[in-house]
C-alpha cells in the first residue's frame, strides 16, 4: 500500500479516537460493552431482536448499563426495580423525550409523542384535560365504544363464517372510536377516506418496526442523503396529517365557541383564549401533528392487541372456552357488555391483562431523556442523556410471573380465582410519559373482545398446536404474524 495512504488512514483513525474519547462532561455513566468509533455498539446488537440483546447485556453489566447507538450514549434500565425507580421515584428527572431524528423530522418538535420541555408539558396538560372533558373514563366514551362494537359485529357477520384476515376489520373499530373523539364522526367500513387512513396507519407501523428504520435514528446524518424507508414513513405520516388538516379547516369554518363538539373544537377554542401562549404554540400545524399522534396511537395500540388476542385465543381454545362461559354467566346473550361487568369477570379481565403482558407490544417504549444532571444509584447521568427502559424485563419478570414465556391468565388470578393486580403490569410504560390513552385502550379491549366472543366462535384454519404466535419484533413495537380465522355466529 502507498505510504501516503497508510499515513492518511492512520491519522484518520487517530482523529476518530480523539473525537471519540470520553469527555469530562459525560459524567460517570454506567458500565457497558466497549463501543467502536462512529458505530458505537450498533454491530453488537441484534436489530431484529433488540430485547434479547438487552437481556444478554444485563447478565454481564447488571440492571443499569450504557449502550452507544452510533456516537450517542444511552443508559439502559433493565428489570422492575430500575425501571420503577427511574420513571416513578425520579419521575421528573426522567420525563424528557430522547432524540429520535426520524420522528422529530416528521413532527417538527410538536404534538405530544415526540415533543420536549415546556411544549410537551403544556400539550400533555391540555390533552389530558380535554380528553377528560370529552368523557374519557366515563359513560360518554363507553357508549361510543359499545356502539362501535355493534358495528364491528355487523361487519364480522358479513364474512358468513368464511376464512378472513381480521387485520382490516379489527383495525376499523378502534380507528372509528378515536375519529369520533377527534372530529366527532365515524366512518362506514367501506368509506374511501377511511380505507386510506387505515392503510396509511398500517404501513406507518410496519415501517417503524423494521431494523433499517432504527439505523436512520442512530445515524441521522443519513436522513438527507440516503434513500430508505424513512422517506416512506414521512409520506404516510404526511398523508394522515393532510387528511386531518382538512378536518381542522372544516372545524374552523363551523366553530361555535359555546358548544365544543370534539377534540379539535376544544383546541380551536383554547387558541382563541390563549393567543400568544409560547409554551403551547396554538397553531394549526401543532393541532394537526397532535391529532395525528392521537390518531396513530389510538388506532395501532388497540388494533395490534386485539389481533394478538384473537391469535392467542385460537392457540389456546380451553382459555377461550372459560372466557365465553364467564360471558354467558355474567352478561348472557341479549344485552351488550359494559364496563360494570368487568368487576364480575375476573377470568376475562385476567386474560386481557395476560394478552398485554405476553405480547409485550412496546418492548422498550419510546426513548426517555434526563432533563437535568442526575445522580442515579452510583452513577452521574448528564442532562440530555438518552434513557431506554426495558419494559420486556418488567412484563416478563420471572419473579412476578412464574412462567413468563407461557400465555397464562393465572398470572393475574389469586388462589381463589379473583383478579390480582400487579405493579409489574406496565404495557403503557409508567410515570409522567405514560400513554394518555391507557384508559381508552383498556376499555376498548374489554368491550370489543367480550362483544366478539359473545357473538362468535373463533375457528382456526389449522390445528391449534400449529398456530404461529411469534411476533415480528423491533425496538418500538411487536406485530402479530398474518393469519386467518373464521368468525362463526353463535
Swiss-Prot record:
It is an enzyme of class 1 (oxidoreductase). CDD domains: CYP2C-like. Induction: By growth hormone. The keyword Nucleotide-binding does not apply. Keywords: Endoplasmic reticulum, Heme, Iron, Membrane, Metal-binding, Microsome, Monooxygenase, Oxidoreductase. Gene3D superfamilies: Cytochrome P450. The keyword Heme applies. One of its GO terms (biological process) is organic acid metabolic process. It catalyses: an organic molecule + reduced [NADPH--hemoprotein reductase] + O2 = an alcohol + oxidized [NADPH--hemoprotein reductase] + H2O + H(+). It is found in: Endoplasmic reticulum membrane; Microsome membrane. Belongs to the cytochrome P450 family. This is Cytochrome P450 2C12, female-specific. It comes from Rattus norvegicus (Rat). The gene is Cyp2c12.
Amino acid at each position: 500500500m502507498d505510504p501516503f495512504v497508510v499515513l492518511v488512514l492512520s491519522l484518520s483513525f487517530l482523529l476518530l479516537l480523539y473525537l471519540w474519547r470520553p469527555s469530562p462532561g459525560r459524567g460517570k455513566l454506567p458500565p457497558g460493552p466497549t463501543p467502536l468509533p462512529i458505530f458505537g455498539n450498533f454491530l453488537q446488537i441484534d436489530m431484529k431482536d433488540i430485547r434479547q440483546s438487552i437481556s444478554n447485556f444485563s447478565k454481564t453489566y447488571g440492571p443499569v448499563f450504557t449502550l452507544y447507538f452510533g456516537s450517542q450514549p444511552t443508559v439502559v434500565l433493565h428489570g422492575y426495580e430500575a425501571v420503577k425507580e427511574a420513571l416513578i421515584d425520579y419521575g421528573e428527572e426522567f420525563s424528557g423525550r430522547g432524540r429520535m431524528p426520524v420522528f422529530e423530522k416528521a413532527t417538527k418538535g410538536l404534538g405530544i409523542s415526540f415533543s420536549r420541555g415546556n411544549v410537551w408539558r403544556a400539550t400533555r396538560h391540555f390533552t389530558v384535560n380535554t380528553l377528560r372533558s370529552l368523557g374519557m373514563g366515563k359513560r360518554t366514551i363507553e357508549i361510543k365504544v359499545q356502539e362501535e362494537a355493534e358495528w364491528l359485529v355487523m361487519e364480522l357477520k358479513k364474512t358468513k363464517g368464511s376464512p378472513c384476515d381480521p387485520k382490516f376489520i379489527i383495525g376499523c373499530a378502534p380507528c372509528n372510536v378515536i375519529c369520533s373523539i377527534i372530529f366527532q364522526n365515524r366512518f362506514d367500513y367501506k368509506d374511501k377516506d377511511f380505507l386510506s387512513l387505515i392503510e396509511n396507519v398500517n404501513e406507518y407501523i410496519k415501517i417503524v418496526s423494521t431494523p433499517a428504520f432504527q439505523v436512520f435514528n442512530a445515524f441521522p446524518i443519513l436522513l438527507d442523503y440516503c434513500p430508505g424507508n424513512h422517506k416512506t414513513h414521512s409520506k404516510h405520516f404526511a398523508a394522515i396529517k393532510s387528511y386531518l388538516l382538512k378536518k381542522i379547516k372544516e372545524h374552523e369554518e363551523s366553530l361555535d365557541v359555546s358548544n365544543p363538539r370534539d377534540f379539535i373544537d376544544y383546541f380551536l377554542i383554547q387558541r382563541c383564549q390563549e393567543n400568544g401562549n409560547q409554551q403551547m404554540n396554538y397553531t394549526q400545524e401543532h393541532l394537526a401533528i397532535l391529532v395525528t399522534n392521537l390518531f396513530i396511537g389510538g388506532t395501532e395500540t388497540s388494533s395490534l392487541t386485539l389481533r394478538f388476542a384473537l391469535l392467542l385465543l385460537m392457540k389456546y381454545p380451553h382459555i377461550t372456552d372459560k372466557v365465553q362461559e364467564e360471558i354467558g354467566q355474567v352478561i348472557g346473550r341479549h344485552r351488550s357488555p359494559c364496563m360494570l361487568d368487568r368487576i364480575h369477570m375476573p377470568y376475562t379481565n385476567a386474560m386481557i391483562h395476560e394478552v398485554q403482558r405476553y405480547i409485550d407490544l412496546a418492548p422498550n417504549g419510546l426513548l426517555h431523556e434526563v432533563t437535568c444532571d442526575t445522580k442515579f444509584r452510583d452513577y452521574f447521568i448528564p442532562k440530555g442523556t438518552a434513557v431506554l427502559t426495558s419494559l420486556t424485563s418488567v412484563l416478563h419478570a420471572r419473579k412476578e410471573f412464574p412462567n413468563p414465556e407461557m400465555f397464562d391468565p393465572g398470572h393475574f388470578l389469586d388462589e381463589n380465582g379473583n383478579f390480582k393486580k400487579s405493579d409489574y403490569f406496565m404495557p403503557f410504560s409508567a410515570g409522567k410519559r405514560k400513554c394518555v390513552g391507557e384508559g381508552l385502550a383498556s376499555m376498548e379491549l374489554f368491550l370489543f373482545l367480550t362483544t366478539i366472543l359473545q357473538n362468535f366462535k373463533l375457528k382456526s384454519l389449522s390445528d391449534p398446536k400449529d398456530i404461529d404466535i411469534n411476533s415480528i419484533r423491533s425496538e418500538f413495537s411487536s406485530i402479530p404474524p398474518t393469519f386467518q380465522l373464521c368468525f362463526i355466529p353463535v
